[in-house]
Amino acid sequence: MGAYKYMQELWRKKQSDVMRFLLRVRCWQYRQLSSLHRAPRPTRPDKARRLGYKAKQGYVIYRIRVRRGGRKRPVPKGATYGKPVHHGVNQIKFARSLQSVAEERAGRHCGGLRVLNSYWVGEDSTYKFFEVILIDTFHKAIRRNPDTQWITKAVHKHREMRGLTSAGKKSRGLGKGHKFHLTIGGSRRAAWKRRDTLQLHRYR
């Protein structure tokens, strides 16, 4: 086994004494920093490499802090002006994951970079911390490499805003496995339409 495989196994046992101590100290450190800052290197190099990171020019890591918990509907004094069924203000759950929110914030802050992927690095009772991999698409090391040329195309601008990253696709119900096989047809709406439309074939 290579070194990264050993690191992967360490991260899989988050309740071990070593990892509990490390995560606790790191969370304290991250809380002292600003909510969005550039990290000099990935905290989890094994995970970052699995998600496409390379330790070369053109790749950037940003660490994002996101507040945990549900979403409160932003209405003045709870006045939603509607029917009682839609009066909910406090116990509203956001449709997307906090990881995709972190990606979006990084993408907004670094408008000239493209969001490749992200991963979890820690959490406490108030915050979750994610590291986002961003790519400088105008760097020659990226543009000249056939493996990374795909992200330089204009169609991938702000892919994190349109649910095209891994975290975004998961929130859209797209993926492989038993969690996602009900989303047939490309989207939840298409799957619903397909199931809910009565088809009366001529020869049946």
Swiss-Prot record:
Gene3D superfamilies linked: Ribosomal protein l15e
Q: Which UniProt keywords apply?
A: Cytoplasm, Ribonucleoprotein, Ribosomal protein
Instruction: Output the SUPFAM superfamilies linked to this UniProt entry.
Output: Ribosomal proteins S24e, L23 and L15e
Stored InterPro entries: Rbsml_eL15_core_dom_sf, Ribosomal_eL15, Ribosomal_eL15_CS, Ribosomal_uL23/eL15/eS24_sf
**Do you know which Pfam families this protein is assigned to?**
Ribosomal_L15e
As recorded in UniProt, coiled-coil segments are none
GO cellular component, as recorded: cytosolic large ribosomal subunit
Provide the GO biological process annotations. Answer: cytoplasmic translation
Renumbered to this chain, the signal peptide range is none
Keyword Ribosomal protein annotated? yes
Cell location = Cytoplasm
User: Which SMART domains would you find in this protein's record?
Assistant: Ribosomal_L15e
State the Gene Ontology terms under molecular function: RNA binding; structural constituent of ribosome
The family line of this record is: Belongs to the eukaryotic ribosomal protein eL15 family.
Subunit note? Component of the large ribosomal subunit.
NCBIfam families documented for this protein: PRK04243.1
Sum up the protein's function in the record's words.
Answer: Component of the large ribosomal subunit. The ribosome is a large ribonucleoprotein complex responsible for the synthesis of proteins in the cell.
Q: What is this protein called?
A: Large ribosomal subunit protein eL15
Q: Which organism is it from?
A: Mylopharyngodon piceus (Black carp)
